[in-house]
């Protein structure tokens, strides 16, 4: 896949999630995942698990897979370099989601440089 895209002059930015892996880590640490209206309620402890999974395990595994397929890449998170700016999710009915938010601005310069 990477060689096909490369031959066409394409540059790719891969954005990933990791819900199942986050749930698995939380379960291993004895914390139950809580979902409200389909969104994971994210308190401080859950946010730490999210960061470990997304910024650590999955990020590095994806970069390794890309490299092994003949591509090259670097793993960054949306928090790095202010890539994304977000505001806390404000549900009109007052539902509290913890650290869940909406991205309001993207600063792509970090990936363009």
Where are these regions (language model features)?
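Nucleotide/pyrophosphate-binding catalytic subdomain
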Residues: 1-113
């Amino acid at each position: 896949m990477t060689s096909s895209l490369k031959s066409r002059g394409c540059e790719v930015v891969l954005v990933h999630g990791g819900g199942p892996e986050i749930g698995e880590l939380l379960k291993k640490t004895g914390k139950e995942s809580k979902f409200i209206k389909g969104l994971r309620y994210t308190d401080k402890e859950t946010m730490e698990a999210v960061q470990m999974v997304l910024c650590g395990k999955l990020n590095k595994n994806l970069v390794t897979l890309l490299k092994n397929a003949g591509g090259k890449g670097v793993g960054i998170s949306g928090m790095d370099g202010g890539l994304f700016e977000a505001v806390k999710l404000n549900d009109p009915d007052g539902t509290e989601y913890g650290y869940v938010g909406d991205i309001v601005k993207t600063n792509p310069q970090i990936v363009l440089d």
